[in-house]
């Protein structure tokens, strides 16, 4: 964490204000029964199991607990990551992609690229390879929006950043609370 805070007083959401998937007891029972039947059918007939579709809530859940590099809070608590700013297109036969728009806490946030890189790394580690991941700064929320977007979606720059052990250590620290 930085000694000199750029945003000394960020707006913080309480954990109970964050979006979450609420499953009713019946839904859980139906879901587990369906999964069990699918597994049995798969074993008996060697039919390839259908893939589970991925929705924005699942992506949000993957990102919400990432720690901010400057504050002892999560990206969800700081509203850097919001459910409504996540787009998922999961095509069975075509291209599948995920776009996450991040909202920096201040327009001149120097941590924006680091946060975006962490989001990209987290998604690339967790998602099947069929997904193309785009991480972008939400329009009008950062002074260097186009430069940050270019860096976050340049495959060579991202790969080079992930080879830097010190930077990778920082990213892993930010993701340490993710389960």
UniProtKB/Swiss-Prot annotation:
Region (Disordered): 1-26
BP GO terms, sorted: chromosome segregation; protein maturation
Tree of life domain: Eukaryota
GO CC aspect terms: cytosol; cytosolic [4Fe-4S] assembly targeting complex; nucleus
Keyword Nucleotide-binding: no
Alphabetical list of InterPro entries matching this protein: FSCA_dom_sf, MIP18, MIP18-like
One Pfam family this sequence matches: FeS_assembly_P
Keywords: Chromosome partition
Family per similarity comment: Belongs to the MIP18 family.
Function in brief: May play a role in chromosome segregation through establishment of sister chromatid cohesion.
Protein name: MIP18 family protein C144.16
Species: Schizosaccharomyces pombe (strain 972 / ATCC 24843)
Top-level taxonomy: Eukaryota, Fungi, Dikarya, Ascomycota, Taphrinomycotina
């Amino acid at each position: 964490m930085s000694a000199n805070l750029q945003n000394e007083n960020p707006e913080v959401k309480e954990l109970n204000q964050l979006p979450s998937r609420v499953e009713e007891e019946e839904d859980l029972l139906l879901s587990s029964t369906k999964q069990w039947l699918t597994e049995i059918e798969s074993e008996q007939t060697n039919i390839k199991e259908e893939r589970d579709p991925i929705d924005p809530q699942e992506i949000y859940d993957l990102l919400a607990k990432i720690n901010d590099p400057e504050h002892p809070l999560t990206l969800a608590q700081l509203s850097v990551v919001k459910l409504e700013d996540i787009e998922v297109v999961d095509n069975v036969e075509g291209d599948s992609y995920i776009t996450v728009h991040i909202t920096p806490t201040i327009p001149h946030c120097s941590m924006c690229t680091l946060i975006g890189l962490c989001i990209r790394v987290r998604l690339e580690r967790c998602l099947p390879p069929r997904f193309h991941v785009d991480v972008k700064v939400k329009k009008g929320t950062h002074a260097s929006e186009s430069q940050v977007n270019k860096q976050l979606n340049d495959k060579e720059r991202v790969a080079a950043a992930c080879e830097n052990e010190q930077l990778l250590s920082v990213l892993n620290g930010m993701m340490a609370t993710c389960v």
